[in-house]
């Protein structure tokens, strides 16, 4: 059984469905007009990404834990391994995030975190479930 939790969900592109109209004219042929229409309304946008403020806080904590320069470029997409974190560093980062945000991260969840964004999403979800 699958479940999704979060404040919102984002769909970037809507699948399209095709429809057609055929017209018979006096000539012995048929002309078909194809039209593609979106299945979802264009204005619908849902997102499950953590707020930018949360990503910034998590980035700052990660930079501090790894003793990175203050001006080091760390974004939500940055993987811990790309900035020199090994498995022990990742455990220490998760422990610091738990302490800083007052949440408890299950071990199996902690092992799945590979990016700043994933950590921020997890912390935000845990705070909402408090």
Curated annotation (Swiss-Prot):
Q: Which chain regions cross the lipid bilayer? A: none
Task: Please describe the organ and tissue distribution of this protein's expression.
Answer: Roots, leaves and seeds.
Output one GO MF annotation: acyl carrier activity
PTM notes: 4'-phosphopantetheine is transferred from CoA to a specific serine of apo-ACP by acpS. This modification is essential for activity because fatty acids are bound in thioester linkage to the sulfhydryl of the prosthetic group.
Pfam families xrefs: PP-binding
The lineage's top-level taxon is Eukaryota
Pathway listed for it is: Lipid metabolism; fatty acid biosynthesis
Carrying O-(pantetheine 4'-phosphoryl)serine, the residues are 87
The record's subcellular location field reads: Plastid, Chloroplast
Q: Where is the Carrier domain?
A: 52-127
| Keywords, alphabetical | Chloroplast, Fatty acid biosynthesis, Fatty acid metabolism, Lipid biosynthesis, Lipid metabolism, Phosphopantetheine, Phosphoprotein, Plastid, Transit peptide
Q: Which Gene3D superfamilies match?
A: ACP-like (1.10.1200.10)
What are the boundaries of the transit peptide? 1-48
Q: Does the keyword Chloroplast apply?
A: yes
Checking InterPro entries in the record gives: ACP (IPR003231), ACP-like_sf (IPR036736), ACP_chloroplastic (IPR044813), PP-bd_ACP (IPR009081), Ppantetheine_attach_site (IPR006162)
Primary subcellular site in the record, as a coarse category: plastid
GO CC, one annotated term: chloroplast
Its family remark reads: Belongs to the acyl carrier protein (ACP) family.
> What job does this protein perform?
Carrier of the growing fatty acid chain in fatty acid biosynthesis.
Protein name (database record): Acyl carrier protein 2, chloroplastic
Q: Which organism is it from?
A: Spinacia oleracea
């Amino acid at each position: 059984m699958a479940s999704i939790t979060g404040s919102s969900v984002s769909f970037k592109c809507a699948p399209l469905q095709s429809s057609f109209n055929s017209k018979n004219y006096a000539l012995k042929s048929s002309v078909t007009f194809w039209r593609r229409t979106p299945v979802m309304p264009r204005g619908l946008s849902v997102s499950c990404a953590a707020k930018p403020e949360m990503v910034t806080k998590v980035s700052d904590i990660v930079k501090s834990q790894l003793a990175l320069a203050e001006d080091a470029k760390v974004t939500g997409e940055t993987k811990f391994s790309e900035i020199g974190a090994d498995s022990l560093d990742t455990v220490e980062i998760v422990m610091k995030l738990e302490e800083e945000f007052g949440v408890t991260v299950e071990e199996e969840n902690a092992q799945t975190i590979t990016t700043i964004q994933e950590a921020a999403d997890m912390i935000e979800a845990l705070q909402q479930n408090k």
